[in-house]
A protein has these predicted regions:
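ATP-dependent adenylation/nucleotidyltransferase module used to activate substrates
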Residues: 1-200, 206, 395-400
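ATP/NTP-dependent adenylation/nucleotidyl-transfer catalytic domains that generate, transfer
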Residues: 17, 24, 208-400
Length: 400
């Protein structure tokens, strides 16, 4: 551990002194990534050093139902390990708040039922529905206690610009004033104790904990022991050119990468979009043919990879999982359920919706499907060789 780390750690402790101080409750936003994990452990360090075993900690975890499965499994397990360690070794109580999007806000519902296309930087629908809205609900349950977040300036430029827009800048050097680490968002006090940390600080700090919590080894494996700038997130994210996590988790995950790419390509085709007569873009939602392709891609990808999209099983409407609604129950039952749930939107925009038979029966769209397969096989010639064969395998399996 190099000397510079002691400086940033002391800064973080000072921030906790300032904003947690003598409070008896605090919340930590825990995604399961390296930064939020380091922050959660830093809080235990602070509790021990300051003798604050009277502090109650709440881990707030937002499950998008679209996370890379391995990361979501890690996050759920680590929260239990953290709670047990905190109770036995630190003497503090740890609770959880786990939120997830409403079933009708999930990736699967929005794409298959409403025909949402792959997000762009000007239409980040996934961020709002899968992350922000569930997070707001979680924050309302937290109350008026501070919530600690693991955002760092060493991360993406988008996150840094977001923090700066909220006034979280300091006219002096980093660490010289507390405005740099703090802001008020509505009724919530948000604190960023490790904002000035670099990635090397995070990994050095996590290494200190590996001897205390063996399960941290799994986090190191997921991040290739800190050797690559890997970021975890939704498996279907098209806001990145390359989802690096699919490449490092094993070849089976390259089937997910192939489907992610195919979703982007499908969304970009004008003849796979329903035209609109108003609005900024005249390209509307995915056509029934495009939705049928997406439904088949989901099934094919699960079969080829052996990886289940857990969001299909963990989200229910009227006692049915999304998997049952989209693929298993009778078409009449599925249509009736969707019509009840979407009645208001169907009345307002009937052209956006289609019956479940048109999504399940890909044979109804043979002309468009074959045209898309031809398009993909040609386009795949120009992509990364490592994923090319997976794209070709997946798309050709759609028509088998």
């Amino acid at each position: 551990m190099f000397d510079g780390f002691s400086i940033v750690k002391n800064e973080s402790f000072n921030v906790l002194d300032k904003y947690v101080g003598n409070l008896n409750k605090v919340a930590v936003a825990f995604s399961g990534g390296k930064d939020s994990t380091a922050l959660a452990l830093l809080l235990l360090d602070w509790v021990l050093e300051r003798g604050r075993s009277d502090l109650d900690i709440t881990l707030v975890h937002s499950n998008t139902l679209s996370e890379i499965p391995e990361m979501e499994f890690w996050a759920k397990k680590f929260m239990e390990v953290y709670k047990d360690y905190a109770r036995k070794n630190v003497g503090v109580k740890v609770d959880f708040i786990v939120t997830k999007p409403k079933p009708i806000d999930t990736f699967f519902w929005r794409v298959l039922v409403r025909g949402y296309v792959a997000p762009t930087f000007s239409f980040r629908w996934c961020v709002e529905l899968l992350k922000r809205q569930p997070s707001k609900e979680a924050l309302s349950r937290v109350g008026d206690i501070p919530i600690l977040l693991g955002h760092r300036d060493d991360e993406s430029g988008f996150r840094v610009s977001t923090l700066n827009r909220r006034g979280m800048v300091c006219p002096l050097a980093t660490g010289r004033c507390y405005a740099y680490y703090y802001n008020v968002d509505g009724n919530n006090i948000k604190v960023y104790p490790i904002r000035s940390w670099r990635a090397t600080h995070v990994w050095d700090y996590l290494r200190l904990w590996r001897t205390k919590i063996e399960y941290l080894d799994r986090l190191f494996q997921l991040y290739l022991y800190g050797t690559l700038p890997v970021r975890y997130g939704c498996w279907h994210c098209t806001l990145v050119k390359k989802q690096m996590t699919h490449y490092i988790l094993g070849k089976n995950y390259l089937y997910l990468e192939a489907t992610r790419i195919l979703f982007r390509w499908l969304s970009d085709l004008t003849w796979m979009r329903i035209p609109k007569d108003k609005g900024y873009s005249r390209l509307g939602p995915l056509t029934p043919a495009a939705r049928a392709i997406m439904a088949r891609l989901i099934q094919v990808t699960e079969k080829l990879s052996g990886i289940k999209f857990y969001g299909l099983d963990e989200s229910e409407i009227e006692g049915y999982s999304l998997r049952q609604i989209f693929f298993e129950i009778s078409p009449q039952e599925a249509n009736n359920l969707i019509q009840r749930i979407e009645q208001r939107h169907i009345e307002r925009s009937p052209w956006r919706f289609t019956e479940i038979e048109n999504i399940r029966n890909i044979g109804k769209h043979k002309e468009y499907v074959l045209r898309f397969v031809e398009h993909v096989n040609e386009k795949a010639k120009h992509v990364d060789e490592e994923v090319r064969e997976y794209i070709v395998t997946v798309i050709n399996s759609v028509v088998e």
